[in-house]
Every structure is written in structure tokens, then in C-alpha cells.
Amino acid sequence: MHTLVLVRHGQSVWNLENRFTGWTDVGLTPQGREEAAQAANLLRDGGYDFDACLTSVLSRAVMTLDILLTGLDRLWLPVTKSWRLNERHYGGLQGLNKAEMAAQYGEEQVFVWRRSYDTPPPALDPADERFPGRDRRYATLTDAELPRCESLKDTVARVMPFWHDVMAPAIASGTRLLVAAHGNSLRALVKYLDAIGDDAISECNIPTGVPLIYKLDASLKPLEHFYLGDAEAVARKAAAVAAQGKAKG
């Protein structure tokens, strides 16, 4: 049996401000740092250990992983950073407040932008400063790989080569992986692992800073999965994620 641990980054500054973040590089709030520290405590107390780590190239995930490894006394572990684990690119919505968008366009439209499988948000113009082609960390990406926006379907298409080429071979060889990433890149992995349908994935809400444990068989099929921590607290955090796209009352 293999164990895979997934952790969404701790609360970011734009999570707190309820903005669409996507590939915008924002840091963690004090609460986000505390969430990551608590996640490290849960993993340590649960007896989890790791051989290698994976994260995105966005600061909030990298910072979360650093806090996790500090708490686990494993700062020396090898870390691979990949743009393929980045958050979904929210295109022209990046930086905009979700509740304000719900008030302007309606909660149903914002739900479609946030949670539908194959409907992308408005695309960025390549001249827009938010376009990733203007960021040196993506200098090696081809024009086809640089998103102007992404649906979850697009995010799945980006993440799955990383699963097949990097993650699955490592897990199959016995490597214990710790992955610190983002709500939608993790939803892409969860959709694949649990064979969740295109419509049903809209109900999957991954809370910040809570370890999600997968127990996998020899063929890397899930035997079980569960969150570490108090079940009611985890459910409240997941419900808060679902409510982010509602207009303020």
C-alpha cells in the first residue's frame, strides 16, 4: 500500500480578501501560516514521513511547504517545483472580488466560472500585465502552454501529464510524496484518483491547510482517503470555500 499526502496552501492574502487569485503570486496571511503549522503538527502526530516533496511555482504553496517541512524537521528533503501544479488560471477575473462579481453578474454565473468543469472565465489579452508570458518564471513555456484563462478541464489537462510522468512513477517506486498545491490543481488530482464525474466535481471543495491522505493500492487506485483533523472543523472550512462565490447579504 502507498500513501500520498495532498495539502492545499494555507489561507492567502487574496483568499482573505475573497478575490480570484489564479496565477497571481500572493503570500500567506498569518492565519495561513498557522494553518500550515497546524497541518505539520497533524502529520507529525499521525506518524507520517516523506521522501520527496512537490509544489507549484507560486509563493503561497512554496511557503506552505516550507512551513510544513520546518514543523516536520524535514527541510532537507528534495523539493520539485512545477508550473503544472499551479492554481487554475482565472484569466480576466484575477484580482476581482468574488462577492462583488456575484452581485454584478449573479451567483449562478460566478458558480459557473468557479465550479463548472469546462466553462472558462474571460480570457486575458497577451498585453495584459497579468498574462503569464510576461513573468520570467514561465520563460521556458511554449506559447501553447501559456494560458490566457483555464477551465477546470484545462487544468486537468495540464496536471495529468505531471501525474503520469512524475508522481505516479515516484509513488509506485515507494517514494512517500508530500504535495503542497492549490484548490483546483488538487481538485484535478482528486477527480482523477476518485473517478469523479464532470458534473459532480463542482461539489468538491478543498479547504486550506488541511492534509488530505490517500491510501493507494499497488496499481495506485484509492483504497481510502480522508482529511486529518477534526471532521466538523474540516467540514466548516470546506463549506466556507463553497460560499465564496455568493453575494454579500
Swiss-Prot record:
Residues at the site labelled Transition state stabilizer: 182
Residue ranges crossing the lipid bilayer per the database entry: none
Signal sequence coordinates: none
EC number: 5.4.2.11
One annotated GO biological process: glycolytic process
SMART domains the record matches: PGAM
Recorded metabolic or biological pathway in which this protein acts: Carbohydrate degradation; glycolysis; pyruvate from D-glyceraldehyde 3-phosphate: step 3/5
Active-site residues, record numbering mapped to chain: 9 (tele-phosphohistidine intermediate), 87 (proton donor/acceptor)
Any one GO MF annotation of this record: phosphoglycerate mutase activity
Keywords for the protein's UniProt record, in alphabetical order: Gluconeogenesis, Glycolysis, Isomerase
Binding site for substrate: 8-15, 21-22, 60, 87-90, 98, 114-115, 183-184
Reactions accelerated catalytically: (2R)-2-phosphoglycerate = (2R)-3-phosphoglycerate
Function recorded in the entry: Catalyzes the interconversion of 2-phosphoglycerate and 3-phosphoglycerate.
Subunit note: Homodimer.
Stated family: Belongs to the phosphoglycerate mutase family. BPG-dependent PGAM subfamily.
The protein, known as: 2,3-bisphosphoglycerate-dependent phosphoglycerate mutase
Gene source species: Solidesulfovibrio magneticus (strain ATCC 700980 / DSM 13731 / RS-1) (Desulfovibrio magneticus)
